Amino acid sequence: MQTRRVVLKSAAAAGTLLGGLAGCASVAGSIGTGDRINTVRGPITISEAGFTLTHEHICGSSAGFLRAWPEFFGSRKALAEKAVRGLRRARAAGVRTIVDVSTFDIGRDVSLLAEVSRAADVHIVAATGLWFDPPLSMRLRSVEELTQFFLREIQYGIEDTGIRAGIIKVATTGKATPFQELVLKAAARASLATGVPVTTHTAASQRDGEQQAAIFESEGLSPSRVCIGHSDDTDDLSYLTALAARGYLIGLDHIPHSAIGLEDNASASALLGIRSWQTRALLIKALIDQGYMKQILVSNDWLFGFSSYVTNIMDVMDRVNPDGMAFIPLRVIPFLREKGVPQETLAGITVTNPARFLSPTLRAS
């Protein structure tokens, strides 16, 4: 276990600034090659990452569920094939990298991620951290032990695969529980030790990002290493700009989530909400107009299998968004372009910002 002194010293490195790129379907030029990002196929240079979706899932489940009951998803092979088809569609639309923020307790299967990544030729960054479904053996751990677990998955590898995590995922909904506070503190310490960034799940309508920020800052973690997720679940621009002004990345990652037309489906409405994707996408432009282009990350929070909700929810979601992970490049980017957002800005949001965030040493200006 590293001491806090070592942890803080390890986090002190600063990097060079990144310039904008001319296109966002692929990397048009170089944004630097000296730093590397862990993916399930091994480290890549930041210039290889390209158009990146920063909050996605191949499968949303619980620890061990896929291995114990693959037939729930048809079969493991069927799930893999669906994921490959979806990622190939996203790749054809310009996506080169996704960040799969499935943690141990979301049923993360990094062998599946590696298989799908190879077949679809899309880079996948795997996550350590914890969500809302940790087993008792995790809930009994101290902050020091949780830090050790996160560091193991970043520095040594996940399980016995040798695949290293490239991001730390944590979650709160409303006021953090005492255990969630420990998880956030452990995430901050692991990030300080490694440079690997932290991304969060929030209930944006309850302004969760404010408490999360306070916990991270109490541990000495720079806001530039944290993305406050699901931030498009609110229209409270003052809440978002206050976080952005402090240096936090703002994750607008629920954009295709809308149960409009399905208002009579209580499960869909509870999960997806009744807000149009256009309303969510306009938050991107609002933050750009406020001068926070460098603080924006966009994604879909989409999946190809989902067992941690009602049984038929994946069928409903596929009807809501048949584009899957291709939704951002196929729908949102053209929409923003029509609203007058320049191509260079769109490239900054989808290529430069994610590369800077995922890089263990590069920092925001």
UniProtKB/Swiss-Prot annotation:
InterPro entries to which the protein is assigned, alphabetical: AryldialkylPase_Zn-BS, Metal_Hydrolase, Phosphotriesterase, TAT_signal
PTM-bearing positions, type N6-carboxylysine: K169
Cofactors: Zn(2+)
Alphabetized CDD domains for the sequence: PTE
Catalytic reaction(s) noted: An aryl dialkyl phosphate + H2O = dialkyl phosphate + an aryl alcohol
GO biological process, any: catabolic process
Subcellular location: Cell membrane
UniProt EC number: 3.1.8.1
Any single Pfam family the record assigns to this protein: PTE
GO cellular component terms listed in the entry, alphabetical order: plasma membrane
Modification comment: Predicted to be exported by the Tat system. The position of the signal peptide cleavage has been experimentally proven.
Membrane topology: Peripheral membrane protein
Binding site for Zn(2+) 2: K169, H201, H230
Applications (biotechnology): Has attracted interest because of its potential use in the detoxification of chemical waste and warfare agents and its ability to degrade agricultural pesticides such as parathion.
Coiled-coil residue spans: none
UniProt: Zn(2+) 1 binding residues: H55, H57, K169, D301
Signal peptide extent: 1-29
UniProt-recorded Gene Ontology molecular function terms: aryldialkylphosphatase activity; zinc ion binding
Domain of life: Bacteria
PROSITE patterns: PHOSPHOTRIESTERASE_1, PHOSPHOTRIESTERASE_2, TAT
Cofactor comment: Binds 2 Zn(2+) ions per subunit.
Subunit details: Homodimer.
Functional summary from the UniProt entry: Has an unusual substrate specificity for synthetic organophosphate triesters and phosphorofluoridates. All of the phosphate triesters found to be substrates are synthetic compounds. The identity of any naturally occurring substrate for the enzyme is unknown. Has no detectable activity with phosphate monoesters or diesters and no activity as an esterase or protease. It catalyzes the hydrolysis of the insecticide paraoxon at a rate approaching the diffusion limit and thus appears to be optimally evolved for utilizing this synthetic substrate.
Family: Belongs to the metallo-dependent hydrolases superfamily. Phosphotriesterase family.
PANTHER family the UniProt entry points to: PHOSPHOTRIESTERASE-RELATED, PHOSPHOTRIESTERASE-RELATED PROTEIN
Record protein name field: Parathion hydrolase
Organism lineage: Bacteria, Pseudomonadati, Pseudomonadota, Alphaproteobacteria, Caulobacterales
This protein's encoding gene: opd
